[in-house]
């Protein structure tokens, strides 16, 4: 099987396009898991709420229709396309400046590159789109006041001002920085390890590395995701208030609420996003005549 990447350092335009395509494909493919995770995190304690992601997805599809599983999907696809493009171009730019003459990156430097990339994508793309997506899913639990992503944006801005789209900026930036650091850092460690053992980066090995990075990311960063979601509900909450509410409602275990839902998504998305990114990078470099 042909390898997906060479030792060539990706050019910025390649990272931007490949990252955007990878993010869009990943978001569209795994959205039902994201919907289930967000819905569970927004609900107060309820014995009637399924905690198994597949069961919740089936229940929602049966009671509300399959379309309900894609509530807020367009917003997430747009946001994920943008954030993945920003993440990969930021990460690759920093990685290129920190890597040695052989193009290798130490684990510590890989984590630093991930933190910076995560913070950058949070400010430029993630916070506004996550705010809208979370508000749409939260709104769908009751009588709807939002007709679409655009309508939700208009209502939120008209009612609370433009700054409302950045509600939860601190919690989102913490979550994105941690997620990107762990995800990109873990993938970099695995990639360097495979390279050291002369294992070629095929589609299969790349998917496995990405999937494993996704699993590590879920349990290492879930508290940040839970706090971010609570802060970005329709009513909104400050960082400290969100933490207190979660602790009061569920105890310490509540900070990992929705982890099984997120695991299903990141297991797939980790494999998908890195596989698509590496493949797109390879194809774009081939078209540009870069060896």
UniProtKB/Swiss-Prot annotation:
One GO CC annotation: mitochondrial inner membrane
Family indicated by similarity: Belongs to the mitochondrial carrier (TC 2.A.29) family.
Encoding gene per record: ctpB
Lineage: Eukaryota, Fungi, Dikarya, Ascomycota, Pezizomycotina
Record-listed E.C. numbers: 7.-.-.-
Entry-linked InterPro entries: Mit_carrier (IPR002067), Mitochondrial_sb/sol_carrier (IPR018108), Mt_carrier_dom_sf (IPR023395), TXTP-like (IPR049563)
Protein name stated in the entry: Mitochondrial citrate transporter B
GO MF term set: citrate secondary active transmembrane transporter activity
Membrane topology (UniProt): Multi-pass membrane protein
Keyword Nucleotide-binding belongs to the record: no
Function description: Mitochondrial transporter that mediates citrate export from mitochondria to cytoplasm. Both ctpA, ctpB, and ctpD play important roles in citric acid transport across the mitochondrial membrane and function in a redundant manner.
């Amino acid at each position: 099987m042909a390898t997906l990447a060479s030792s060539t350092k990706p050019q910025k335009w390649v990272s931007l396009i490949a990252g955007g395509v990878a993010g869009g494909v990943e978001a569209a493919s795994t959205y039902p898991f994201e919907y289930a995770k967000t819905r569970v995190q927004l609900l107060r304690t309820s014995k009637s709420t399924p905690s198994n992601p597949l069961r919740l997805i089936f229940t929602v599809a049966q009671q509300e229709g399959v379309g309900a599983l894609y509530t807020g999907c367009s917003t997430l696809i747009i946001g994920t396309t943008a954030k993945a493009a920003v993440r990969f171009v930021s990460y690759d730019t920093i990685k290129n400046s920190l890597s040695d003459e052989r193009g290798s990156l130490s684990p510590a430097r890989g984590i630093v590159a991930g933190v910076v990339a995560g913070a950058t994508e949070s400010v430029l793309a993630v916070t506004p789109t996550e705010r809208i997506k979370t508000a749409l899913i939260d709104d769908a639990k009751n009588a709807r006041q939002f007709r679409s992503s655009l309508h939700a944006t208009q209502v939120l801005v008209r009612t609370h001002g433009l700054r409302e789209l950045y509600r939860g900026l601190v919690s989102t930036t913490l979550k994105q920085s941690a997620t990107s650091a762990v995800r990109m850092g873990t993938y970099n460690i695995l990639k360097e390890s495979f390279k050291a053992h002369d294992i070629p980066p095929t589609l299969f090995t790349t998917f496995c590395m990405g999937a494993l990075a996704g699993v590590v990311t879920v349990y290492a960063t879930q508290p940040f995701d839970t706090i971010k979601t609570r802060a970005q509900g329709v009513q909104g909450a400050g960082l400290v208030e969100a933490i207190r509410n979660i602790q009061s409602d569920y105890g310490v275990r509540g900070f990992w609420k929705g982890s099984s839902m997120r695991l299903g998504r990141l297991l797939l998305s980790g494999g998908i996003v890195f596989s698509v990114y590496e493949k797109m990078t390879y194809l774009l470099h081939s078209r540009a005549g870069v060896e």
